[in-house]
Regions:
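N-terminal charged/capping segments associated with class I S-adenosyl-L-methionine
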Residues: 1-51, 64-84, 94-100
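Class I S-adenosyl-L-methionine-dependent methyltransferase module
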Residues: 50-144
Length: 144
């Protein structure tokens, strides 16, 4: 399943529409995605956060039966969230679409996948790197 059976949803909007607690002020929204097979709902929700005008923290929890699908989602979300200084909009779009819909990729895309894959392995297996990322996240959260 590559493309999904439903259009991308703004899950924060869906929560506001159907929640019985819609007038209750919450600081954190936890979203569990099971078998979504791609990150379209995550991307749409993140892209639409400005419309809601709140400072809501959104946690996404993704469960997939196949670890390959999780790795694919993480790679696609990494491309979408890559800083503009690292990857321009046109390059980001080409890379995202190439990985989203193709089996064969260009050499430049294969190099990007290899670099990011090594970074992901480092993130998971190196405790010092995890502590560094956590500290960096805390500092960035405090600055914002």
């Amino acid at each position: 399943m590559w493309w999904g059976y439903s259009p991308a949803l703004d899950l924060q909007d869906e929560w506001e529409r159907y929640s019985s607690k819609k007038y209750e002020i919450i600081k954190e929204l936890n979203i569990l995605l099971i078998g979504a097979a791609d990150g379209r709902h995550v991307v749409k929700t993140l892209a639409q956060t400005y419309r809601h005008g709140n400072n809501l923290k959104i946690n996404f929890y993704v469960y997939e039966a196949s670890l390959d699908l999780v790795a694919r989602q993480v790679m696609l979300l990494t491309i979408a969230l890559e800083p503009p200084e690292e990857l321009g909009l046109q390059d980001k779009t080409r890379l995202f679409l190439e990985l989203y819909g193709n089996t064969l990729v260009r050499p430049a895309t294969a190099n990007f996948i290899a670099r990011k894959s090594a970074q992901f392995v480092h993130m998971v297996t190196d405790l010092d790197f995890q502590v560094y990322l956590w500290c960096e996240f805390i500092v960035c959260s405090l600055v914002v």
